[in-house]
């Protein structure tokens, strides 16, 4: 499968996209700084052109790091593009080093055996949806109607990946499990999980 990480300079000059190869630099970024686009593609698709078009269309005035993977699911190919915000602490790394790569929790595969279909996580002020261990959707639930965000998130994945809500394994942080939330998940595969201690007070 295709897996690449690219860096774009401040002017977003597409001609200066550069593949990152060096494994020595580890960067951890905040969840809110990741933007995900998922596109259905075919084997003849020019991936680089798709990436360039996405950057031009959605992030013209934004300086991101870009990580993308091709995922095969239900006999279809999907291009998953992660636009990763780069704050001031890391910008100097982009200019000081010719090549480096990224390592951070949101893009790492978890235990692949727990991702037979789709996994939905609600914890630490965000919703994350994984397909076969790949993060394909990330949304903040801060200052939001949680049930509305849950429904909206699942509908988009059902449509894109042709997966039913009954195929999901739901992992919900215990602080979110109020009565109305429990009622919504009634009859579905629901697991209670723990979040980060310092975020409990914000929920």
Where do the model's predicted regions map?
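Hydrophobic/aromatic-enriched cytosolic interaction surfaces used to assemble or bind macromolecules
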Residues: 1-203
């Amino acid at each position: 499968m295709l897996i690449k990480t690219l860096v774009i300079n401040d002017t977003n000059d597409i001609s200066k996209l550069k593949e990152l190869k060096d494994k020595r630099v580890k960067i951890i970024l905040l969840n809110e700084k990741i933007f995900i686009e998922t596109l259905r593609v075919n084997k003849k698709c020019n991936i680089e052109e798709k990436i360039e078009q996405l950057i031009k269309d959605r992030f013209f005035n934004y300086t991101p790091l870009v990580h993308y993977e091709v995922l095969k699911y239900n006999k279809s190919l999907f291009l998953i593009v992660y636009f990763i915000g780069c704050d001031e602490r890391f910008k100097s790394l982009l200019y000081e080093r010719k090549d480096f790569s990224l390592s951070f929790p949101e893009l790492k595969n978890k235990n692949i055996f727990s991702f037979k279909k789709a996994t939905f996580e609600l914890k630490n002020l965000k919703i994350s949806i994984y397909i076969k261990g790949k993060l394909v959707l990330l949304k903040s639930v801060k200052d939001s109607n949680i049930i509305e965000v849950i429904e909206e998130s699942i509908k988009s994945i059902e449509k894109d990946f042709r997966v039913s809500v009954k195929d999901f394994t739901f992992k919900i942080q215990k602080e979110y499990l109020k009565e109305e939330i429990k009622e919504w998940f009634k009859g579905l595969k629901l697991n209670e999980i723990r979040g980060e201690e310092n975020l409990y007070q914000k929920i």
